[in-house]
């Protein structure tokens, strides 16, 4: 029998509901939901109970588990029928903590860089689909294309040829209004140069441009700003990494393919970020394998296990493995990211799971 019976021996109260929910643990951060102040707006209406669970990210991968355990706790401890329990989910994405607060991009909770040790591993594909997947989960997301020598975000997001506008900011300085598509705010050097014109800039010029894109673009409010970094470990990549570290970068996600030549370059990239004291969030393996659409047979075109071995070596989580799919490629070419497609070889749910895993990783870093 619960804490109160159907006969009304003990009246249903907010206190009893909170006591029941205090037995539910936050599965990743530890501690119970009540102590972490994640339970809000408890309401009692006869035998009906409703409340909100304030998650640390709208892309929480364990939302279903939390909901089931809340229902079980209220049902078994408070004696309320499951059909009389109503749970709403909200989220409060905690801004990047620590000494970088003063330098943080105004209105942006987390700045996350997506990098690669070499070109051709699908870093921009991961960046765009990760950004859209986070938005699909309910997050407010921006995408900054910092790959100045190969800006592909305008094409991959279907906004080629568009140009951002500017307005006067509160301090009288011009503020750029980002281009928007698929629920994402975007900025790219590709909006400012012709497609067939070369971009011949050195590191300091690129760093200055990046700073302008961070502080003179009207990003706010954002939960996550995803930055598509230039590949490699050369002057430009190093300069950008140092610049981002100075503005409170939450961390970096590194993208690789399975083969050794790619993971070797990723190791160099990881070492570069370590040298400039940037937190490493994890590794994504792109083009992990190919499933033939006519036979269903799997082919490990670029080998297998490379990212997993690298993750174990570096003590980093393997955030996701994205298969090679024709719809992933065609979606990038057509400006329709794969994550919004229902084609089997678009692997939309795989991208969404990557987004949830990354969001959980950031939450653990900030709330633990």
Where are these regions (language model features)?
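Phosphate-binding/switch loop-helix module in NTP-utilizing enzymes
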Residues: 190-239, 243, 263
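C-terminal lobe/tail of nucleotide-utilizing enzymes
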Residues: 2, 9, 14, 36, ...
């Amino acid at each position: 029998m619960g804490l109160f019976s159907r006969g009304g021996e003990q009246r249903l109260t907010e206190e009893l509901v909170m006591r029941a929910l205090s037995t539910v643990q936050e599965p990743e951060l530890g501690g119970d939901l009540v102590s972490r102040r994640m339970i809000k707006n408890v309401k009692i209406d006869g035998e009906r109970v409703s409340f909100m669970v304030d998650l640390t990210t709208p892309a929480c991968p364990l939302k279903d588990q939390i909901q089931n355990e809340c229902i079980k706790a209220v049902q078994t401890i408070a004696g309320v029928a499951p059909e009389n329990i109503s749970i709403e989910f909200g989220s409060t994405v905690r801004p990047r903590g620590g000494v970088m607060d003063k330098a943080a991009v105004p209105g942006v909770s987390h700045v996350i860089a997506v990098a690669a040790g070499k070109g051709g591993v699908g870093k921009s594909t991961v960046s765009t689909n990760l950004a859209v997947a986070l938005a699909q989960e309910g997050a407010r997301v921006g995408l900054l294309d910092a790959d100045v020598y190969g800006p592909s975000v305008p094409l991959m997001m279907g906004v080629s040829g568009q140009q951002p506008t500017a307005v006067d900011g509160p301090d009288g300085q011009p503020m750029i209004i980002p281009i928007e598509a698929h629920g994402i705010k975007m900025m790219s050097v590709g909006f400012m140069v012709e497609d067939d014109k070369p971009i011949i800039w050195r590191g300091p010029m690129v760093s200055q441009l990046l700073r302008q894109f961070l502080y003179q673009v009207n990003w706010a409010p954002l939960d996550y700003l995803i930055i598509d970094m230039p590949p490699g470990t050369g002057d430009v990549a190093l300069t950008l990494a140092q610049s981002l570290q100075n503005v409170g970068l939450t961390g970096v996600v590194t993208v690789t393919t399975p083969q050794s030549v790619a993971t070797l370059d990723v190791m160099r990239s990881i070492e570069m970020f370590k040298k400039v004291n940037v937190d490493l969030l994890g590794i994504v393996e792109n083009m992990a394998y190919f499933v033939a659409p006519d036979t269903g047979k799997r082919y490990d075109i670029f080998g297998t296990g490379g990212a997993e071995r690298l993750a174990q070596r570096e003590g980093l989580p393997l955030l996701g493995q994205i298969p090679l799919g024709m719809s992933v490629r065609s979606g990038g070419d057509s400006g329709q990211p794969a994550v919004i497609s229902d084609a089997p070889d678009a692997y939309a749910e795989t991208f969404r799971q990557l987004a949830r895993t990354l969001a959980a990783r950031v939450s653990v870093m900030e709330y633990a």
